């Protein structure tokens, strides 16, 4: 890759200091003063870069690696050439995340779209809105009547903050996002194009065969340290609240229906759909393209495999997969049995396809 001007190199941190900051042990103390300026993948890392390895699959890439250090565990350290210093840790993935945050802190939240700071010309701030000192609003953003925004928060170009919305401190509302009927905590990141607080999908049968819209008069509550991906949609509650718990991370293109309650520190991957009034416990992980039926409960610490369909409650701590989702051991056993029967049937037909 040519020089990446989107994320310029760090001015430099001592390798020894980096090791201390990420909780790793440096294999060669003689290089502790070497400066580290950035992160890079193994195959193109150069002097001044730090990279990481989680498996032996990258072994061949070590031949071209010129990194100043590799973050890895003991099992991987045994295959790293002696010319490359090792930052030894039991949790290399976590250590690399910490290193990246130190070296490229500006990449932890969406970047500024203009060089302007403060309230930019072209932004519309309703006279009744209240903004603490240090709020930044980019051109073409709209802040509605009675909205309140905490210090250190950035409202990017084209974002819309609806009337009476509350946004805490040190948040980022990215370009083109819209926030309506919502209370948002501190250190929340909303990525471009996300839609928060629009009305949920609720209709009743009409007297003449049509559909009558059910009013949605609830709110969305997003707690501290939540991150919501681009083009994700979170509907407000019908009469209650839709809640996203503290520290939860939601990928791009996720749909969260009205009255859903998601616990703390969950991870929800792209294209997941969660229907209205579902309950998601703390620490739940949901793989990409999974669907969660309305009014179901997923217990604390449960894991849902990608492309699964959750039609009924999932107990705490369980791993479920398949359609309909069931205990992973049962699902995998069924898949293996179907594959075996298919193979036997194919052999009986002399290897000929139907």
UniProtKB/Swiss-Prot annotation:
It comes from Sinorhizobium fredii (strain NBRC 101917 / NGR234). Pathway: Bacterial outer membrane biogenesis; LPS lipid A biosynthesis. SUPFAM superfamilies: Trimeric LpxA-like enzymes (SSF51161). It catalyses: a UDP-3-O-[(3R)-3-hydroxyacyl]-alpha-D-glucosamine + a (3R)-hydroxyacyl-[ACP] = a UDP-2-N,3-O-bis[(3R)-3-hydroxyacyl]-alpha-D-glucosamine + holo-[ACP] + H(+). Belongs to the transferase hexapeptide repeat family. LpxD subfamily. Signal peptide: none annotated. GO terms for biological process: lipid A biosynthetic process. The active site is at 258 (proton acceptor). This is UDP-3-O-acylglucosamine N-acyltransferase. Its EC number is 2.3.1.191. InterPro entries: Hexapep, Hexapep_transf_CS, LpxD, Trimer_LpxA-like_sf, UDP_GlcNAc_AcTrfase_non-rep. It comes from the Bacteria. Catalyzes the N-acylation of UDP-3-O-acylglucosamine using 3-hydroxyacyl-ACP as the acyl donor. Is involved in the biosynthesis of lipid A, a phosphorylated glycolipid that anchors the lipopolysaccharide to the outer membrane of the cell. GO terms for molecular function: N-acyltransferase activity. The keyword Plastid does not apply. PROSITE patterns: HEXAPEP_TRANSFERASES. Homotrimer.
């Amino acid at each position: 890759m040519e020089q990446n001007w989107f994320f310029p190199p760090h001015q430099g941190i001592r390798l020894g200091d980096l090791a201390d900051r990420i909780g790793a042990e440096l294999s060669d103390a003689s290089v502790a003063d070497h400066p580290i300026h950035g992160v890079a993948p193994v195959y193109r890392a150069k002097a001044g870069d730090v990279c990481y390895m989680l498996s032996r699959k990258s072994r061949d890439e070590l031949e071209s690696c010129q990194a100043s250090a590799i973050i890895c565990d003991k099992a991987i350290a045994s295959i790293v050439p002696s010319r490359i210093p090792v930052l030894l840790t039991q949790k290399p993935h976590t250590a690399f995340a910490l290193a990246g945050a130190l070296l490229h802190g500006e990449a932890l939240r969406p970047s500024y779209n203009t060089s302007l700071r403060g309230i930019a010309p072209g932004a519309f701030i309703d006279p009744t809105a209240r903004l603490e000192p240090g709020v930044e609003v980019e051109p073409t953003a709209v802040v509605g009547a009675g909205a309140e925004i905490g210090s250190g928060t950035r409202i990017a170009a084209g974002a819309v903050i609806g009337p009476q919305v509350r946004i805490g401190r040190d948040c980022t509302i990215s370009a083109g996002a819209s926030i309506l009927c919502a209370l948002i905590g501190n250190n929340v990141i909303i990525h471009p194009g996300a839609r928060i607080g629009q009305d949920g999908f609720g209709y009743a049968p009409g007297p003449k065969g049509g559909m009558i819209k059910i009013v949605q008069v609830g709110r969305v509550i997003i707690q501290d340290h939540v991150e919501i991906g681009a083009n994700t949609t979170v509907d407000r509650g019908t009469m209650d609240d839709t809640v996203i718990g503290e520290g939860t991370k939601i990928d791009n293109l996720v749909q969260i229906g009205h009255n859903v309650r998601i616990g703390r520190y969950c991870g929800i991957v792209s294209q997941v759909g969660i229907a209205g009034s579902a309950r998601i416990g703390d620490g739940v992980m949901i793989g990409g393209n999974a669907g969660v039926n309305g009014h179901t409960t997923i217990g604390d610490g449960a894991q849902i495999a990608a492309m699964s369909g959750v039609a009924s409650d999932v107990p705490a701590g369980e791993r479920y997969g398949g359609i309909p989702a069931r205990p992973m051991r049962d699902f995998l056993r069924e898949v293996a049995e179907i594959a075996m029967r298919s193979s036997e049937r194919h052999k009986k037909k002399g290897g000929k396809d139907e």
